[in-house]
Structures are given as structure tokens and as C-alpha cells.
């Protein structure tokens, strides 16, 4: 994506302070523990990923949709909009912004119905309840809350540059790319610039693959303390995954703060 990250709205408005993030969540954490809250977001990141794959979207589009989703709830309670409505809305908006091409409304709704029924029936007993008018209305609300800051810089491009600098390492690239996908289940996209996320994921991949690149990392002009924080956040989500049980998701969704039903017209 063209443009300079440092002059972008992503850098200037959407690299958030961790304390602000924690404070904004307090309303939801009256109903949920921190771990339960994180598991709900892992679940919806999975929903966005599967919807995106079914719609044959590029990973960049799926990642942007996930960041929109996380940004919305960084400033709003889960009770503001049902996450099951916001997830496909984020996909619709991301596909436009990333110039993937238009997803027809009917195809989006049909895909949501199929995915919820076939892949996530453990969480939802009912069929997907929303229609095109709900998604279009939700899109206006999402745009307003994102303050129309729609360009999202992802760690994939910095990763390709880093790998090129190291020397073509296919195995390292593949694993780090997957770790960047995993990082979407954490808060790092809200807290750190994408190049730091790429380096944090690369560092984990080097440990897993037993690649000795300490000297190369030492030459990087980067705040290694921040990189370590990113690596810890990703390793923490792996720990959380160990206790992530599909059977408990329905109970967590029932416990989650809910939007008030709209008044009958």
C-alpha cells in the first residue's frame, strides 16, 4: 500500500495506549473475565478468517477487517453492536478499501448463513439472523466510529523487506507470515507499528526454527523492548489457545453484554 506510515491516520490516531485500552474495556469486564473477553475476540477473529476464506479474499483484506473489528471495540462496549453483525460488516468495508472488488450483498449474507451453520453451529443454534439492510446500517456506524481512518498498514510488507535483507528464507517467511496471522488474535495491532509486529513475529520464528540471527537483530534500529512485548503477547495467546474449548463459546456469548433490542416501529 502506497504512502508513509508515519504520516498516516493509522500512526497518528490508531496506535493506542495500553492503559486507555484497558480502561475502555472495564464495562465489558464487569460481565466477563479478561481471559473470557480474549476468548470471545479469538472466536470472532476465527469467524472473520473463515468468512474471508469462503469469500476467497486475500489475507490482507481479512487482516484489515480484523483490525477494523478490534478498533471498533477498543472504543465501544460489546453491547453497542452484536459482534456477529459487525464481523461481516468489517469484511465488506475492508474489501472496498483494499480494492479487492465488490462483494455482492446477497453473496455476503449467503456466505454468513452457510459459515455459521456449517462451521460455528457449536456457538450458534439459530441461523445467521441479519440481512443486507442491517449490514449497510452497521457500515455507517462503523465508518463513523473509525473516524473514516480506513487505511491500515499491515506487517506483511515489512516482513517481505526483512526477509529480503536476511536472504531468501522460504521456511522463515512462511512461519513468520503465519505468526502475523496469529497476532490478529491479540491486541498488538492496536498498540504497535506494523514493522515492530513483523520483527516480533520474526524473532519467534527464528527461535522455533533455531535460526541464529542475533547479530542481524542487533543491527536493527528498533526498540527491542517493544519487540519483546509483542513476542510475549503472541506467546500468551498460544497459552490461551490451550484452554480454548469450542464447547464453552456458546456460554461466553450468552454471558457477553448484549445490545438492547431496537424499538418496534
From Swiss-Prot:
Gene Ontology BP terms: regulation of transcription by RNA polymerase II
Disulfide-bond pairs as recorded: none
Record's keyword terms, sorted: Activator, Cyclin, Nucleus, Repressor, Transcription, Transcription regulation
Entry-linked Gene3D superfamilies: Cyclin-like (1.10.472.10)
Cellular location(s): Nucleus
SMART domains registered for this protein in UniProt: CYCLIN
Listed GO CC annotations: nucleus
Superkingdom of source: Eukaryota
GO molecular function list: cyclin-dependent protein serine/threonine kinase regulator activity
SUPFAM superfamilies: Cyclin-like
Domain Cyclin N-terminal: 48-151
Function: Component of the Mediator complex, a coactivator involved in regulated gene transcription of nearly all RNA polymerase II-dependent genes. Mediator functions as a bridge to convey information from gene-specific regulatory proteins to the basal RNA polymerase II transcription machinery. Mediator is recruited to promoters by direct interactions with regulatory proteins and serves as a scaffold for the assembly of a functional preinitiation complex with RNA polymerase II and the general transcription factors.
Family listed: Belongs to the cyclin family. Cyclin C subfamily.
Quaternary context: Component of the Cdk8 module of the Mediator complex.
Protein name: Cyclin-C
Organism annotation: Aedes aegypti (Yellowfever mosquito)
